[in-house]
């Protein structure tokens, strides 16, 4: 069996990269922050790729809706990262590493949604 279609999508690949970077980032937090904001940010980042993947096996209209949900999850992830930054849980170097991934993913998500006719 070959790779599922979603694994070949550049937008999915970038979403996976972001989710893995956030996972590594949260691992250094104390238990309280891992259990609260950490879980939220990991789940929201993981859901970006999950929605992209789920959409690839749906009809176009449902795929569009799932990609919109993925974009909403990206916004939730950005919100959580802003909170983490304000709470001094993220260093400047970590932020500099994650920001380009977010920028690329945002652009790719919007382009992917547009390519689906939305």
Residue ranges, per PLM feature:
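Amphipathic alpha-helical assembly/interaction segments
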Residues: 1-118
